Swiss-Prot record:
Upregulation: During infection of the host cells. Down-regulated by itself. Activated by Mg(2+) starvation in a phoP dependent manner.
Name of a matching Pfam family: MarR
Keyword Repressor: yes
Phenotype of the disrupted gene, per the record: Decreases expression of genes encoding virulence proteins. Decreases virulence in mouse.
Main location per the UniProt record: cytoplasm
Subunit structure: Homodimer.
Lineage: Bacteria, Pseudomonadati, Pseudomonadota, Gammaproteobacteria, Enterobacterales
Residues of the HTH marR-type domain: 2-135
Name of the protein in question: Transcriptional regulator SlyA
Location relative to the cell: Cytoplasm
Organism: Salmonella typhimurium (strain LT2 / SGSC1412 / ATCC 700720)
Length: 144
């Protein structure tokens, strides 16, 4: 009998995300907010929405909804690009700067707890296997 690997991976992602959402709730953030803020923080300043969507690996319309929420919370600002009026540049606010370390601490602690009892060799192997699966899937997409 074949292993339901796809279902297992999907379930793992769902419960991991739910735990992150739960742990970030006191900060009034979600896993989606964290991924977005983390990427804005890691990328060079004044990224466009298009560049940010590519870095995260999502479509721009999906990103816009999250950016609207983060802007409403006062965590980002968006300005129209001088050279391309259709493009928006994204910046973290001072409020976000203060929150980033707290948010990253929650993520780091949670990741450590999730990976407890798993050796660094096992984690490296898992990362390699996931990369192979991703490569195979991308190859299949390119042939369809």
């Amino acid at each position: 009998m074949e292993s339901p690997l796809g279902s297992d991976l999907a379930r793992l992602v769902r419960i991991w995300r739910a735990l992150i959402d739960h742990r970030l709730k006191p900060l009034e953030l979600t896993q989606t907010h964290w991924v977005t803020l983390h990427n804005i923080h890691q990328l060079p300043p004044d990224q466009s929405q298009i560049q940010l969507a590519k870095a995260i690996g999502i479509e721009q319309p999906s990103l816009v909804r999250t950016l609207d929420q983060l802007e409403d919370k006062g965590l980002i600002s968006r300005q129209t690009c001088a050279s391309d009026r259709r493009a928006k540049r994204i910046k973290l606010t001072e409020k976000a700067d203060a929150l980033i370390a707290e948010m990253e601490e929650v993520i780091h602690k949670t990741r450590g707890e999730i990976l407890a009892g798993i050796s660094s060799e096992e984690i490296e192997l898992l990362i390699k296997l996931i990369a192979k699966l991703e490569h195979n899937i991308m190859e299949l997409h390119s042939h369809d």
